[in-house]
UniProtKB/Swiss-Prot annotation:
Residues binding Zn(2+) 1, per UniProt: C142, C145, C199, C202
Domain notes: The J domain is necessary and sufficient to stimulate DnaK ATPase activity. Zinc center 1 plays an important role in the autonomous, DnaK-independent chaperone activity of DnaJ. Zinc center 2 is essential for interaction with DnaK and for DnaJ activity.
Summary of the function given for this chain in its UniProt record: Participates actively in the response to hyperosmotic and heat shock by preventing the aggregation of stress-denatured proteins and by disaggregating proteins, also in an autonomous, DnaK-independent fashion. Unfolded proteins bind initially to DnaJ; upon interaction with the DnaJ-bound protein, DnaK hydrolyzes its bound ATP, resulting in the formation of a stable complex. GrpE releases ADP from DnaK; ATP binding to DnaK triggers the release of the substrate protein, thus completing the reaction cycle.
Subunit note: Homodimer.
Organism listed in the record: Macrococcus caseolyticus (strain JCSC5402)
CR-type Zn finger ranges: 129-211
Name this protein carries in UniProt: Chaperone protein DnaJ
Subcellular location: Cytoplasm
GO MF terms, alphabetically ordered: ATP binding; heat shock protein binding; unfolded protein binding; zinc ion binding
Record HAMAP family: DnaJ (MF_01152)
Any single Gene Ontology cellular-component annotation: cytoplasm
Cofactors (names): Zn(2+)
J domain span: 5-69
Domain of life: Bacteria
Amino acid sequence: MAKRDYYEVLGLSKGASKEEIKRAYKKLSKKYHPDINKEADAEDKFKEIAEAYEVLSDDQKKAQYDQFGHAGMGQGAGFGGQDFGGFGGFEDIFSSFFGGGARRDPNAPRQGNDLQYQMNVTFEEAVFGAEKEISVKKEVECDTCDGSGAQPGTNIKTCSTCGGRGNVHVEQNTPFGRVRSERTCPDCGGTGKEFEEKCSDCGGTGRKVKTVKISVKVPAGVDTGQQIRLSGQGEPGINGGPAGDLYVVFNVQDHAYFDRSGEDIFYTLELSIAQAALGDEVEVPTLEGKVKLTIPAGTQTGKRFRLKEKGVQNVHGYGRGDEYVTVKVMTPVKMTNRQAELLREFAEIDGHDITEQPSNFFDKTKRFFKGE
């Protein structure tokens, strides 16, 4: 199978800058990373993107590729025999030079580009689900020319330079001698079309950039990094092809007092020394409101209670997580004289001879002037 053009893989033109190449690689590699994208061909696309970037990000390799195409990546082209994998055999090299193999019809329908949108949602929206409206800046079909690229009332002709093929034959000297290869037509840009007059609104592209409002249903239980696909909400297709898709990636904001890990949530319960020592019945917050929790006498800091199925529901509907309540016993910082006196009595009964210490500089100063 003939390899795709590296610039095409990254969605770029041949004159793309280093920054454009890097930006395209970061966007596409994130989109097709096998850990994020679970589609069957995601891994193959990810490898193809990485291979294209490896060549186009290196000045020497890029220059060789720009001159000789995929054939320039072989061992005879000065790369020290580096194996890029999947480049095919000797037939593929000559196929790329002499125009063998399948050619893409410039007028064939092609699917539009996919888009990605980073969406912030509150903790509650992620837990319970929500419906929100987002504004996406994207290319849409030009409504003046209906996507044709031609000024209304004018004709579209077959490109006189390439005869509608979208490519032209070029002869050049290579390590294999003088060969004939194919290049994108410089006059029609590969479309195979020639406009009598380009659309005054879109300049002949058939597209315009607009900010479009799209309704998004946030699934209950969604977490940071998870995404949904909105079919057909990407960029418009080419030559009547289907539109691309829009991938919405969620970022869940922090909650005031709940932490989350997967479907489980965590809450820190502060107790006084008396509550922890004597036990108590307290109210703790859950996702649906407050519930009563019994604290046994002698509870220590770090003690964890489990509230079964009080966590977040699984985003796919497979059950629900738990809520974990962790105790933190709070030592009093400011006490009345009576409170301090009772603690001294407790220490004495408990058999502890305590050497009291001031809590801060002002207490030290106060005790100094009192002669303590």
